[in-house]
């Protein structure tokens, strides 16, 4: 199940994203209400309006139930810090934090160019990312996760690093500039 609100709307509608940062921007409130009524069990059509707060609350309740049932979560990561083995998830809704803390097993999938050497480097990227992607000073949620801790969060962890031809691009003196994009 997709946990980002806009991605959830797209998934429940069996639709395709229309924008990389705002995947459901092509859907109006009335459409979203109808999608929720059709896909989320237990919603009352007589009380659910197309008010954004009500729609967000319906999605929150739906997702919370899924989070509490999930034994395994698959998450991405914005950065991985080699110095400490820390993964960083930057987001605006708190859904990533739920993935990092509630399931028994966490599987994180990350492109290799997201691996950075030190905490000092992370500080720079945490300032650049929100300014570059959404023109914000900072993201609402930044979660840092440094592995399994007995009795706290996932007790099993797997990191999948994806290359996708990036090492070939990195080896190319001209092509490597393409990997500078955060």
Identify the function of each model-found stretch.
Residues 1-174:
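The feature marks the mature, well-folded catalytic cores of soluble enzymes
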Residues 173-182:
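Cysteine-centered iron-sulfur cluster-binding motifs in ferredoxin-type domains/subunits
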């Amino acid at each position: 199940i997709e946990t980002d609100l806009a991605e959830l709307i797209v998934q429940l509608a069996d639709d395709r994203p229309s924008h990389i940062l705002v995947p459901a921007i092509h859907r109006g409130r009335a459409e979203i209400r109808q999608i929720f009524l059709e896909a989320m069990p237990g919603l009352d059509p007589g009380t659910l309006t197309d008010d954004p707060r009500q729609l967000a609350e319906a999605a929150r309740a739906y997702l919370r139930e899924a989070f509490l049932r999930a034994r395994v979560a698959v998450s991405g990561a914005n950065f991985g810090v080699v110095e400490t083995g820390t993964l960083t998830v930057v987001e605006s809704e708190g859904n990533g934090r739920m993935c990092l803390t509630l399931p028994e097993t966490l599987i994180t999938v990350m492109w290799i160019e997201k691996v950075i050497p030190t905490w000092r480097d992370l500080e720079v990227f945490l300032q650049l990312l929100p300014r570059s992607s959404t023109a914000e000073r900072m993201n609402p949620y930044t979660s840092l996760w440094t592995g399994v801790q007995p009795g706290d969060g996932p007790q099993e962890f797997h990191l999948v690093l994806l290359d996708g031809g990036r090492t070939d691009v990195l080896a190319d003196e001209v092509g490597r500039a393409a990997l500078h994009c955060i």
